[in-house]
């Protein structure tokens, strides 16, 4: 019987999660969904000083926004300390781990001497029990660390789904500290216990964990566990070619939401940031899950391209449901001081969205419908609301007022009739109308704008300009 696929995302809640971090959630999520398996969230919060619930909330919020639903968790490592201590005790009892009383000063001196001899700095196994070896009496009052009894010969081998076959000689690995003097377990130990207890079959994570992998595999083997499949993802680089990080200007995942990006655009972009399905650039979440595999993960670092993300976001805005976009855009309009009343917001979105890269862009254009009575620049009024144009404006207002139906086509036909009657070109009449109705010279198509403003508002505003 084939083992059920189980993947995990195991972030540290230290206050910031950027696109590179969340990609390490997206890929295991997609693989679990593709394989009809389980996606587990584990919060690695053993760094008590840097971890916070606020940071956990940011992680959960970002995952929820992107639709990365979890099947189990979140599990918190700090809530599993009893389990870790249980396994530590078992390892000591079975000879898989041992207490080491070497002080920090002694270890530093050892490493310095090794460096002077041109050797790789490493623990020398002084306190490691061996047949026939007589250990010194433990120093009084010194609390030991616990070290894992790493194999002395052989090698660690795994076929990484991204990097291929990797082999590390055990001679390169010293006896890893798995518990500190105060008894708290270390990162590599906790990860192994968690992955075994949670029956994780595929570990998909950043390649900064490659060096941890042989140590973790040896502990897994010692505990009699099954080694998972590893896939170590290359680094995500920022625009400057540096590793993406808060220090180098990366924005948080929820920051993209707050800037007006759609979650489907971010998911689509992240999916292609290190994985490919032929030449496909635009695909739905469902297609991504259907297509995702480990074989087509990229082997080279992926570089963040904000223009590509903006292009994708523009696409999803253009094809997006206008009612949904209206609700998502409303807060951005209100943040600009607009009051969403009068013009139908769904209709406004349909009119203005095509050239927008973000919902902020949509809101900026839509604002002309929701900022109250227009306050056009006096110089522009003087330039465009000339005495010569007044008769045409009056005629336009009269004919618009007489329309049986307030529809874009009828408004367009009325403009054409007035232009023909007075021998004018469209800009000569449209510019003053834009100023009077919208308070600005640049708007979408004038007939569509007037339709959305509504008959009463249009006639009132044109009338105010004619009377002035």
UniProtKB/Swiss-Prot annotation:
One of its GO terms (molecular function) is tRNA binding. One of its GO terms (biological process) is glutamyl-tRNA aminoacylation. CDD domains: GluRS_core (cd00808). A motif ('KMSKS' region) lies at residues 243-247. It is found in: Cytoplasm. InterPro entries: aa-tRNA-synth_I_cd-bd (IPR045462), aa-tRNA-synth_I_codon-bd_sub2 (IPR020751), aa-tRNA-synth_I_CS (IPR001412), aa_tRNA-synth_I_cd-bd_sf (IPR008925), Glu-tRNA-ligase_bac/mito (IPR004527), Glu/Gln-tRNA-synth (IPR000924), Glu/Gln-tRNA-synth_Ib_cat-dom (IPR020058), GluQ/Sye (IPR049940). A motif ('HIGH' region) lies at residues 11-21. It catalyses: tRNA(Glu) + L-glutamate + ATP = L-glutamyl-tRNA(Glu) + AMP + diphosphate. Its EC number is 6.1.1.17. Coiled coil: none annotated. Gene3D superfamilies: 1.10.10.350, HUPs. Keywords: Aminoacyl-tRNA synthetase, ATP-binding, Cytoplasm, Ligase, Nucleotide-binding, Protein biosynthesis. GO terms for cellular component: cytosol. ATP binds at residue 246. NCBIfam families: gltX_bact (TIGR00464). Monomer. Catalyzes the attachment of glutamate to tRNA(Glu) in a two-step reaction: glutamate is first activated by ATP to form Glu-AMP and then transferred to the acceptor end of tRNA(Glu). Belongs to the class-I aminoacyl-tRNA synthetase family. Glutamate--tRNA ligase type 1 subfamily. This is Glutamate--tRNA ligase. It comes from Cupriavidus pinatubonensis (strain JMP 134 / LMG 1197) (Cupriavidus necator (strain JMP 134)). The lineage of its organism: Bacteria, Pseudomonadati, Pseudomonadota, Betaproteobacteria, Burkholderiales.
